[in-house]
Amino acid sequence: MPRQISLEKTRNIGIMAHIDAGKTTTTERILFYAGKIRKVAETHEGGAQMDWMEQEKERGITITSAATTCQWKEHKVNIIDTPGHVDFTVEVERSLRVLDGSVAVFCAKGGVQPQSETVWRQADKYRVPRMAFINKMDILGADFYQTIGMIKDRLGTNPVPLQLPIGKEDTFVGIVDLIKMNAVIYKDDLGQDMETTEIPEDMKELAREYREKLVEAAAETDEELMMKYLEGEELTEEEIVAGIRRGTVNVQFTPVICGSSYKNKGVQLLLDAVVAYMPSPLDIPAIKGITPDDEEEVERHSDDNEPFSALAFKIMADPYVGKLAFFRVYSGVLDAGSHVLNSTKGKRERIGRILQMHANTREEVSTVYAGDIAAAVGLKDTTTGDTLCDPDHVVILESMVFPEPVIHVAVEPKTKAGQEKMGIALQKLAEEDPTFKTYTDEETGQTIIAGMGELHLEIIVDRLLREFKVEANVGKPQVAYKETITQAVEVECKYARQSGGRGQYGHVKIRVIPQEPGKGYEFANQVVGGTIPKEYIPAVDAGIQGAMQAGVLGGYEVVDVRVELYDGSYHDVDSSEMAFKIAGSMAFKDGMRKGKAVLLEPYMKVEVTTPEDYMGEVIGDLNSRRGKIEGMEARSNGMQVINAYVPLSEMFGYATDLRSKTQGRATYSMHFDHYEAVPASIAEKITASK
């Protein structure tokens, strides 16, 4: 079947925001106006179509990014709703990887909140074009202009308003359209009845001022337009729109519009803006990949005639069809029932059925084209970040890198019968979520689950019960400490065993060098003259990596070291891979002992918003938790924002303490930032308790 909607008229967008900025409600309204939903649901009543996991309905927050397809004015819009809670940044990260553009939703009262910054930085990393929707213009304390200022100062982008609000809080009735230079007034509760009229007299001067900024921003995207503008000529509406689109697609600035999704104001205009200014798959650069044989770089363009290539960006267990793999098609066409190659794993896969998702209902399609987002049934070996491609034109697209978990807890089923069920369930959940890990502690035999924060693990335990009917007891959260060295050392190890017959002989000399934080592990072979034969070098590397799994201080994973193998010797008869593996392992452990090993702990970036009266208490409490106060800023509503870095080990139970210290008036958010050395006195206690 030929393509129904052209690539130019396809939009793949994400909706991203801080928790509670109104993101899911905004998506709901978009689907309502695009005709996908009959009745509008309210998120805080637990009825939203996008929030379809049980826990999401209860908590009123979005956890898994649901991909939805809808149509607006002859355009196909694929929307990915992403979670705003910091524990779920992995969902945001992988959504951004497959999107062409994004709508950032801000609360007109809260402005740019910490998670907005985190998500914005993630979008910067992938150079995703963005537009901003300032939501909740109807609530007490809404301030459009303050939010614009925060977008500029905190996110480092140039916000260009396309609209100005008419009134605010209770009196928010409509918007001024700065392109058409008219006013749009909402006449009914559903936002269906809109009246276009003249700009109110008291806003004309302000509208002219902002229109001038808008026209200048549009003109700066094109030399011809700039000349016309500088010569004092008027730009046409078409030229302004084309300029804004160009500037948005090239990430030169961020167009801003406003409304109130809950009150159904501004959502159709948001859809119009998505169609007008967000990029189509043709506007984004070709995706790069490598050929597995010779690692040559190749490009795939958004074109149905190119060989098929796609990226699997999410795996989900579905109660009706089993495993669902969400993927983005970058080039070519895919038919249901056809065979593809999972080039990341080197395995052929058969596509069973192809589904286009609408929150949690689905429509079966026979073919998907370049630029489409869909879900496939029947992919057995595919996991998040894998490339699917035409077996005759093999390519591996750049995969996604996910952060390591920072917190872990022990779990055990309440019944003996639950043990096997729990093992299977945890494996399935780990398949879905690359930042969730599960393993068995070899010393205690306990099952350990590890993730990005307390809420993350709570949701996992909750899902064990709801989806897999496994009741589990959960231990106390533990911090994921790491180890590293602080001093470069040279060590040698000669491993020789003679016990009748063939012996074991491996001799290595290595340098162990500390790396800057986050650099990871590097191994360099600097052996010259064949003092260690080539075939034994990988064994030395494997031995070192094995030893890194359990450091010398408390048995924690070792990170951020470079090891240079520069010399050694071998024996014609007695040397073996095993001997060199053991020699590498022993040499590394010796290097750790001599290299002044230190314990590292995760530090969280914490932002506390508190009334001024409690500032002293809150700061004193953060200091007592070994926090480092980075800065403070006053908000217009009498609140103070405190930014700090605090060790994760000191943050357990913080929510309860903060509530009691501020009579429930302060809020906080935190996310993992970096690892740092633990003070010696505390490190001793930690290692002694192991």
Curated annotation (Swiss-Prot):
GO terms for MF: GTP binding; GTPase activity; translation elongation factor activity
Domain tr-type G: 8-282
Pfam family, one: EF-G_D2
Any one Gene Ontology BP term: ribosome disassembly
Cellular localisation: Cytoplasm
Domain of life from the UniProt record: Bacteria
Binding site for GTP: 17-24, 81-85, 135-138
Gene Ontology CC: cytoplasm
Keywords recorded for this protein, A-Z: Cytoplasm, Elongation factor, GTP-binding, Nucleotide-binding, Protein biosynthesis
Keyword Transcription regulation applies: no
Role of this protein: Catalyzes the GTP-dependent ribosomal translocation step during translation elongation. During this step, the ribosome changes from the pre-translocational (PRE) to the post-translocational (POST) state as the newly formed A-site-bound peptidyl-tRNA and P-site-bound deacylated tRNA move to the P and E sites, respectively. Catalyzes the coordinated movement of the two tRNA molecules, the mRNA and conformational changes in the ribosome.
Family from the record: Belongs to the TRAFAC class translation factor GTPase superfamily. Classic translation factor GTPase family. EF-G/EF-2 subfamily.
Protein name, per record: Elongation factor G
